[in-house]
């Protein structure tokens, strides 16, 4: 898919994948490989992740699931792809979670190929908090648009997001970063 308009036709604007694609495009993603899944399970996501990683041009991959089993399988697939020269960085997040829960999940995954994003976010035009996969999609889109990988992410404004569900103390931010969470403000 090369545009949000094209993505809307394929997956629908109101689907989770449609909303993720919108955020990725708003933040600068160019061409996006998307694979809809019928249910939130490791069995459903496995062929989707495999198909995307089989495309060697995939450099960033966003997971739409917040389930630990799905995220663990995602990490395994990304690590296996890297061994086959399929260099791809994954992005994922969680649903409603405390700072401690985010940190614990990131430590449990402990995957150098995955950017674990939190907390939940508010998307423009939405009243309910959106799962971490939406924040992950926005961040992946912004990183896809960057030409210089050495640029810091501090102060990066993600388009299409209006806020986060949690504001952490400095101590909590330090703990999140130490655990491997990319904490949004």
Indicate residue ranges for each PLM-predicted region.
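A glycine- and small-residue-enriched flexible loop/hinge signal that marks low-structured segments
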Residues: 44-185
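An N-terminal, globular interaction/scaffold subdomain
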Residues: 1-64
């Amino acid at each position: 898919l090369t545009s949000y308009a094209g993505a809307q036709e394929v997956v629908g604007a109101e689907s989770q994948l449609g909303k993720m694609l919108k955020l990725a495009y708003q933040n600068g993603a160019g061409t996006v490989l998307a694979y809809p899944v019928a249910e939130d399970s490791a069995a459903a996501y496995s062929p989707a992740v495999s198909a995307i990683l089989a495309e060697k041009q995939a450099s960033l991959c966003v997971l739409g699931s917040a389930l630990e089993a799905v995220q663990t399988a995602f990490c395994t697939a990304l690590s296996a792809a890297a061994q086959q020269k399929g260099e791809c960085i994954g992005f994922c997040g969680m649903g409603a979670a405390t700072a401690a829960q985010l940190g614990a999940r990131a430590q449990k995954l402990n995957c150098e190929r995955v950017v674990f994003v939190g907390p939940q976010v508010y998307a423009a035009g939405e009243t309910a908090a959106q799962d971490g996969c939406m924040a992950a999609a926005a961040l992946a889109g912004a990183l896809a648009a960057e030409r210089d990988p050495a640029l810091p992410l501090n102060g990066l404004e993600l388009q299409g997001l209006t806020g986060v569900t949690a504001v952490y103390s400095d101590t909590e931010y330090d703990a999140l970063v130490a655990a491997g969470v990319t904490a949004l403000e």
